[in-house]
UniProtKB/Swiss-Prot annotation:
Residues 171-265 are annotated as: Transactivation. The lineage of its organism: Eukaryota, Metazoa, Chordata, Craniata, Vertebrata. GO terms for molecular function: DNA-binding transcription factor activity, RNA polymerase II-specific; RNA polymerase II transcription regulatory region sequence-specific DNA binding; zinc ion binding. The keyword Repeat applies. This is Zinc finger protein 641. It comes from Homo sapiens (Human). It holds the Pfam family zf-C2H2. One of its GO terms (cellular component) is cytosol.
Length: 438
């Protein structure tokens, strides 16, 4: 069956090539020679369906509906497709038809080879579903046939690089400088505007390396029909997201503090403050208010940290007070030394007139009352331990005894001096050197 179809197609192609060589007036005569019985198609129907099959010897391939689906499918793939012949003649259309016939004479032409041979007006008239169907057949293996039909396909250099195993095409920065690069700005509502800001210049789109080698990536700069093509036929482009210069000003306005826009001003001196608490603290200097007071001494302060610093002075209460001058002291020993000063002052007041303080001998403080009295001799002492030590002289008791020679002593320092003799040291030398037995 396929051999018969090829022979029929070859005879039809030879006859059609001879007839096209003799044509010189219009496309109507060519339609009559191809099929004299075929009615002329209206202009409106040609725009709706730009492609149709060639009637004639291959007409039985699509008319036999009783055959098996598989055989019908094989016949449909082998059937040649030619463009609908327009009413008016055009030199470009003649060249496309001649190239199509030359390609068909070499072998069967499938729908995949010529599925994208549309003009720009015809491509725009297709539905999105049709453009998706035809667009996916723009492959590397079919580019040669499509180019032979003079269909404009960009990025032919990339196809040669793909065949040689080179990297995909990346735009040259020098070429991009010659082009008018749109500079867009972001207004916050999703709209784009042209601008002269060099920092926001859009970078040229680059192709992803993960795109298949059989897919031709289209660029809107080379074809006006880019807007009408579906997203699946446009290829994959990579570019940075567009920044908009107004977004920086909007971001700044949103982050500015309301207090900076409406500062707090002092009505008296005109000073401005960021925070209202700072203004309230400043106004205390004008009113003289002291809201912080000490609970112990009832002192008032204008700052809280001043009150905290003052409260540290109350941690150590000064209970020792001098009865003469009213001074407070933390220790009683300090009070006793202070009272000696008052005693010396009183003695100085009682000195004779004309006697200078330098010639006056220093007088001791008044003696401590001797309340501890010895019952044997009636001697009195100011300290109790002095009385105990004196009592030993009456009893003859010697409580301090040497552990080596069992000698006893009435005073402890006498025993310490005796122990130095057992060590071979002189008590005088040991005391001079400041050494001790223990």
């Amino acid at each position: 069956m396929q051999a018969e179809d090829r022979s029929q197609f070859g005879s039809a192609a030879e006859m059609l090539s001879e007839q096209t060589a003799a044509l010189g007036t219009g496309w109507e005569s060519m339609n009559v020679q191809l099929d004299g019985a075929e009615p002329q198609v209206e202009r409106g129907s040609q725009e709706e369906r730009p492609w149709r099959t060639v009637p004639g010897p291959l007409e039985h391939l699509c008319c036999d509906l009783e055959e098996e689906p598989q055989s019908l499918q094989e016949k449909a793939q082998s059937a040649p497709w030619v463009p609908a012949i327009p009413q008016e003649g055009n030199t470009g259309d003649w060249e496309m038809a001649a190239a199509l016939l030359a390609a068909g004479s070499q072998g069967l032409v499938t729908i995949k080879d010529v599925s994208l041979c549309f003009s720009q007006e015809e491509w725009r008239s297709l539905d999105p579903s049709q453009t998706d169907f035809y667009g996916e057949y723009v492959m590397q293996e079919n580019c040669g046939i499509v180019v032979s039909l003079r269909f404009p396909i960009p990025k032919l250099d990339m196809l040669s690089q793909l065949e040689g195993g080179e990297e995909q095409w990346v735009p040259d920065p020098q070429d991009l400088e010659e082009r008018d690069i749109l500079r867009v700005t972001y207004t916050g509502d999703g709209s784009e505007h042209e601008g002269d800001t060099p920092e926001l210049e859009a970078e040229p789109p680059r192709m992803l390396s993960s795109v298949s080698e059989d897919t031709v990536l289209w660029n809107p700069e080379h074809d006006e029909s880019w807007d009408s093509m579906p997203s699946s036929s446009r290829g994959m482009l990579l570019g940075p997201p567009f920044l908009q210069e107004d977004s920086f000003s909007n971001l700044l306005c949103s982050t500015e503090m309301d207090s900076l826009l409406r500062p707090h001003t002092c009505p008296q001196c005109g000073k401005q403050f960021v925070w209202g608490s700072h203004l309230a603290r400043h106004q205390q200097t004008h009113t003289g208010e002291r809201p912080y007071s000490c609970l112990k001494c009832e002192k008032t302060f204008g700052r809280r940290h001043h009150l905290i610093r003052h409260q540290k002075t109350h941690l150590h209460d000064k209970t020792s007070r001098c009865s003469e001058c009213g001074k407070n002291f933390r220790c009683n020993s300090h009070l006793a030394s202070h009272q000696r000063v008052h005693a010396e002052g009183k003695s100085c007041k009682g000195q004779e007139v004309g006697e200078s303080p330098g010639t006056r001998k220093r007088q001791r403080a008044p003696p401590v009352p001797k309340c501890h009295v010895c019952t044997e001799c009636g001697k009195s002492f100011g300290r109790r331990h002095h009385l105990v030590r004196h009592w030993l002289t009456h009893t003859g008791e010697k409580p301090f005894q040497c552990p080596r020679c069992e000698k006893s002593f009435g005073r402890k320092h006498h025993l310490d001096r005796h122990l130095l003799t057992h060590q071979g040291q002189s008590p005088r030398n040991s005391w001079d050197r400041g050494t001790s037995v223990f």
